[in-house]
Regions:
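Short, conserved sequence motifs used for protein processing/export or organelle targeting and
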Residues: 55, 62-271
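Short, solvent-exposed loop/linker segments at the N-terminal edge
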Residues: 140-145, 278-286, 300, 369-372, ...
Length: 405
């Protein structure tokens, strides 16, 4: 982590144009809420906690920020392959006595609370004045996977503590994985949101040594995002940043959050196929392939010509239209295509020319279905008028191969 820190104390009567704040308000504001929820993939009541937290955030847009900390026994991945734990979770839980799940804190101003208390505690905090305002923005270089986080803070009143700490949390959304759920049934397709993956400023944050009214904090961090955390892949398009100040290691007067922007694309217009949905073994019937495309360009993607064929046979074309922002993806079901079946079959998909054609193609293999020969015994149970019953057995071409009656 690299950082650049600038602190400027301003006289109360100084013109606002003298200092360089750009993303933080200098007017007194009420507290923003940071809800840190302690959770786990085998915690059956945790989905209810997630829903409660999401409702609080949705009811207070721009004023409530969620951090889901996977920690404790319920976060043990077992054989699932989804280890959402971090090096920071145990210490965060220990300082607030989070030994039941789900539990959480509102601005770290109490011991861990049960989910039934979160809404009331959040409303109380939102009604209190804050002595500091926080603003944050972030950008990710898509070539290097480096995130740059810019945080500003402005003290509108003296902090009760001579030293404060600035914290920057990196979160990941939309991670599909397992979750025990007592209300809706266990699933392997749960959408995990606001998942803490890293604390860019370390366990307890960076020290702020001047905390009097008029103090302006301007800090920039850079952090190289890895390909995965504990084997769980990182998707940079799903990342989120929450910045907050604590008076010690507890008691947050305020915080803020943002979704990163993205820069340094290799091309302005670049669509690429990222995956083809697995195709089950086939008997030679027409298939309807599903392909996922991603906008890996700087400009919005609104149209793509898709050409596809199987086993080198006749190609078909399909034109997709829509709207994808940079790094967004969409799965497209292509119209059915016929082919000459082989033992191993290959579908090839190519996107239309754009600014970078090096990533415009993808292929996927699928097998012929196994054939078996065996004896089939058919028992036909009739009523008292059995002579009126007839039967037919037909093949895949709707031809009658056996009949009776």
């Amino acid at each position: 982590m690299k950082k650049k820190l600038f602190i400027l104390t301003i006289l109360v009567l100084t013109s606002l144009g003298i200092h360089s704040q750009t993303i933080v308000s200098t007017s007194p504001e009420n507290k923003k809420v940071v809800l840190e929820e302690f959770t786990g993939i085998t915690c059956g009541y945790c989905p209810d906690g997630h829903a409660i937290a999401n409702n609080i955030a949705n009811n207070n847009p721009g004023n409530v920020f969620l951090i889901n900390i996977h920690q404790g026994g319920y976060a043990n991945p077992g054989n699932s392959g989804f280890d959402f734990r971090t090096p920071f979770g145990n210490a965060l839980a220990a300082q607030v006595g989070a030994n039941f799940y789900p539990s959480g804190t509102i601005n770290r101003n109490s011991n861990a609370l049960g989910r039934g208390s979160w809404n009331g505690a959040a409303n109380t905090a939102l009604g209190q004045s804050s002595d500091v305002n926080v603003g944050v923005e972030a950008d990710i270089d898509v070539q290097t996977n480096t995130i740059t986080v810019h945080v500003e803070a402005f003290y509108t009143a003296d902090s009760p503590e001579s030293n404060n700490k600035l914290n920057v949390a990196l979160l990941q959304n939309n991670t599909i994985g397992p979750q025990t759920d007592y209300a809706n049934g266990n699933t392997t397709e749960y959408n995990h949101m606001h998942r803490l993956v890293w604390l860019i400023t370390g366990q307890w944050g960076e020290i702020i040594t001047t905390t009097t009214a008029g103090t302006f904090i301007d800090e920039t961090y850079t952090y190289d995002i890895p390909n995965d955390y504990n084997g769980v892949p990182v998707k940079i398009q799903d990342l989120e940043v929450v910045a907050f100040i604590t008076e010690t290691q507890l008691d947050m007067p305020s915080g803020s959050g943002t979704f990163p922007t993205y820069s340094n694309f290799s091309a302005e217009n670049n669509a690429r196929p990222t995956s083809v949905e697995a195709i089950l073994p086939q008997c030679g019937f027409d298939i309807t392939p599903n392909v996922t495309i991603q906008n890996f360009g700087e400009n919005d993607l609104t149209e793509v010509e898709i050409t596809y064929s199987v086993n080198g046979g006749a190609s078909q074309n399909y034109t997709w239209t829509g709207s994808l922002l940079s790094l967004q993806s969409e799965t497209i079901q292509l119209p059915a295509i016929s082919y000459e079946v082989e033992d191993v079959n290959t579908i090839e998909i190519t996107l239309s020319d754009d600014d970078d054609n090096s990533d415009n193609q993808i292929s996927e293999n699928f097998n012929i279905a196994n054939e078996h020969t065996t004896t089939v015994n058919m028992i036909l149970n009739t009523d008292n008028a059995g002579s009126q019953c007839t039967w037919d057995i037909m093949n895949s071409n709707d031809e009658i191969i056996y009949s009776g009656g």
